[in-house]
Swiss-Prot record:
GO terms for biological process: cell wall organization. May catalyze the final step in cell wall teichoic acid biosynthesis, the transfer of the anionic cell wall polymers (APs) from their lipid-linked precursor to the cell wall peptidoglycan (PG). Disruption phenotype: Single mutant has no effect on cell growth or morphology under normal growth conditions. Triple disruption of tagTUV genes is not viable. It comes from Bacillus subtilis (strain 168). One of its GO terms (cellular component) is plasma membrane. It is a single-pass type II membrane protein. Pathway: Cell wall biogenesis. This is Polyisoprenyl-teichoic acid--peptidoglycan teichoic acid transferase TagV. Pfam families: LytR_cpsA_psr. GO terms for molecular function: transferase activity. The gene is tagV. It comes from the Bacteria. It is found in: Cell membrane. Residues 1-23 are cytoplasmic.
Length: 391
């Protein structure tokens, strides 16, 4: 087992109200964000409108696809989680390394989760040229506002709430809950994020991982024959393991200490009253109750730099859209062309499996260029199926 890393402990005084808010969001947001493969993130410091973490969208509280602001306590709603790779841009606008859409129905206490591959080829909401690029470029182009609108166009659903998180904090939380247990599918190694000269080795079978090890376990892709799909399975293991660890009596008792480990670098438009509603509705929620959806598709290489894109399968994407629309009890207004006119996919695209269950997270293959490429002709591309029947 890899060498353990001592984690710096930050002690902060928190008000009773803020402690309650951390209690609300930890089980809900923490587990959802870890599986994305962000490589890590920081949890909410608070969801109070007066707190610096609160940041409204330019559009206001209502999605442009809704007639009125959704009541999270009574009506189905959606949240977009964005893992931002600011670490690579030294605090400047990074790309959304991970995008997770969660839809929740408070009446039936159900939850659906969809991870959008970061290399998905779409037209950005702010683009007027008709060209397409990777969906993860939306954040660097127009921040959270453009990302939210781009995802709305792509999935043809309203995005009511958002949360952005950076990559730090993941290890602290894993360590604070006492580590997690995973079933390693095969032997492999991955470099440590602490020291690039250090390798962390994983052996097939049951392993107990600390934060540094769990981060490496979640990020490795190149040694996995199944590529992103194999990595997605490992990330799902982390999700389930963390949810279960967080639900244990011992960890619930020290939830505030855990929250301190992941208390910074978060922005959200979820208010305190809405957070309280989430606690009441989803208390006792476990990983087994999360219905995960996946987007299937194919590899696409375009342009002079042979840039990689993920091209969604049109049939599968439509099924995913309908599933989310039904869960939100939302019907797109096709008369105005608001939804689907710039959904970012080519109707001619095709791939393998169109199953809508399973977990698909970020397509992490980086192309040599992220520039827009408006070409949609198959004569200028090479496609290879990336779908897996298990998804």
């Amino acid at each position: 087992m890899a060498e353990r890393v001592r984690v710096r402990v930050r002690k902060k005084k928190k008000s009773k109200r803020r402690k309650i808010l951390k209690r609300i969001m930890l089980l809900f947001a923490l587990a959802l964000l870890v599986v994305v493969g962000l490589g890590g993130y920081k949890l909410y410091k608070t969801i109070n409108a007066a707190d610096e973490s609160y940041d409204a969208l330019s559009r206001g509280n209502k999605s442009n696809l809704r007639n009125e602001v959704v009541d999270m306590k009574k009506k189905p709603f959606s949240i977009l989680f964005m893992g931002i790779e600011d670490y690579a841009t030294k605090g400047q606008k990074g790309r959304s390394d991970s995008l997770i859409v969660v839809t929740l129905d408070p009446k039936n206490k159900t939850m659906k989760m969809l991870s959008i591959p970061r290399d998905t080829r779409v037209q950005l909401a702010g683009d007027t040229t008709g060209s397409k690029t990777k969906i993860n470029a939306a954040y660097s182009k127009g921040g959270k506002d453009e990302t939210v609108e781009t995802v709305e166009n792509f999935l043809q659903i309203p995005i009511d709430k958002y949360v952005t998180v950076d990559f730090d904090g993941f290890k602290d939380v894993i360590n604070e809950v006492g580590g997690i247990d995973v079933d390693v599918p095969f032997d492999f190694d991955e470099k440590s994020d602490v020291d690039e000269s250090k390798r962390i080795y994983f052996k097939k079978g049951e392993m107990h991982l600390n934060g540094e090890e769990a981060l490496a376990y979640a990020r490795m892709r190149k040694q996995d024959k199944r590529g992103d799909f194999g990595r997605n399975d490992r990330q799902k293991q982390i999700l389930n393991a963390l949810i279960d660890r967080m639900s244990s009596a011992s960890n619930i008792a020290k939830i505030d200490k855990i929250a301190e480990k992941a208390s910074e670098n978060v922005e959200t438009n979820i208010r305190i009253t809405e957070g309280l509603a989430l606690q009441q509705i989803y208390s006792g929620f476990t990983s087994k109750k999360i219905d995960t959806l996946s987007i299937t598709g194919s590899d696409l290489y375009l342009g002079p730099n042979n840039t990689y894109y993920f091209e969604p399968d049109a049939t599968n994407l439509e099924k995913v859209r309908k599933t989310l629309q039904e869960h939100l009890d939302y019907t797109p207004d096709t008369s105005t062309g608001t939804s689907g006119t710039e959904d970012g996919t080519d109707s001619s695209s095709s791939s393998g499996s169109t199953g809508s269950t399973g977990t698909t997270t970020d397509g992490t293959t980086n192309g040599s260029s992220y520039s827009n490429d408006s070409s949609t002709s198959s004569n200028n591309s090479t496609t290879n199926s990336t779908t897996d029947s298990s998804y």
